[in-house]
Amino acid sequence: MGMGEPLANFTEVMKAITYIHREDGINISYRRITISTCGLVPGIKRLSELHLPVRLAVSLVAADDDVRSSVMPVNTRFPLSELKKALISFQHRNEKRITLEYCMLGGINTTEKAAKSLQKFTKGLEVLVNLIPWNPIDSLPFSSPLDSEVRKFTSTLKSLGVNYSIRREKGRSADAACGQLASETMKSNLIKQ
């Protein structure tokens, strides 16, 4: 995964996917290509209409509109109800399991209520919820969840029948984990100015 929103640049991303798939390109099967999105509903709908057997990963972060809108402004444009309809359509046409990326923010989206909201959102979808502990960034007001929070949250998800995995943390101690490198680059650029 990289920075940027692929579905905001749909035409170019489709050109890239076509090249990646072509035998005279990189020759990678569509089934091994994943498009990650923050949840741009129009782009998901367009992707559905193409019937490409690519995988889809959606940064969900929260399954409650108020919480998701507070950490992901895209949710104010495309609330969860619209996102879910688009995902159902995508899954109906592509018959692929969807990955929901769920960055765990300490004390914000790791509660029992959050787990129940997540279970409700995933009902009727074939998904894998990829739980990702937040990597601390000095300039942002979020904290990593405590181990006890993660255990309680995953225990609740398990009891609710939510299919999940926990991403193994890499690079956190060197400030080189997901999200941290961009933060360091921005900080470095500000210092130079």
Where are these regions (language model features)?
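Conserved AdoMet/S-adenosylmethionine-binding subsite of the radical SAM
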Residues: 2-160, 164-165
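Radical SAM enzyme core and accessory elements
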Residues: 159, 169-193
